[in-house]
Amino acid sequence: GFDPKILTAQRVIIHGREDILGVMGTILIHVMTDEERSKVTKSNEYFIDTGMSADKVKQLVRIGDPITRERALIEMGDCVNSKSLDNRISVFVQIEVMKALQNKEVPYDIYAVFTVQEEVGLRGATAAASGIDPDFGIALDVTMAYDLPGAAAHERISSLHGGTAIKIMDGATICDYRMVEFM
């Protein structure tokens, strides 16, 4: 999702009858009241400036058309930044693992599953697991590198360049200690 605090002036693409570039906008800061300046703009208070007439927009855009951020991949030192990297990185890593295992003898069956709806209850993973009935599963995902200035020590669950993070528990799962130790 989007953090409404950072939407102003973000470039987006409206995926309507054709892709349309736009810029997120809201009331200009120099005409806002003091009260308006002191609060966070809600996502429904933004508009998208396409530079087109209202009639042209109505021809090309329907209610419900998806909107994505317009962001190119950039290199930042030895890191990269782009939109939607979390799931894409996990897919890349999983494909590379399967390539590395392709010609190796392993004493068990390995399934690589790419699933959907993780954020709303692991629906895709649940469906895949019920069809495969695995002895154990390893989920790949990303987490925050919270080694930022001002972060308290207990908030630093992982650090950039610190290696793989292995989850022990979250709000839905407590991982088996044997699996955690194995990994």
Task: Map each language-model feature to its residues.
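N-terminal hydrophobic/helix-forming segments and targeting peptides
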Residues: 1-183
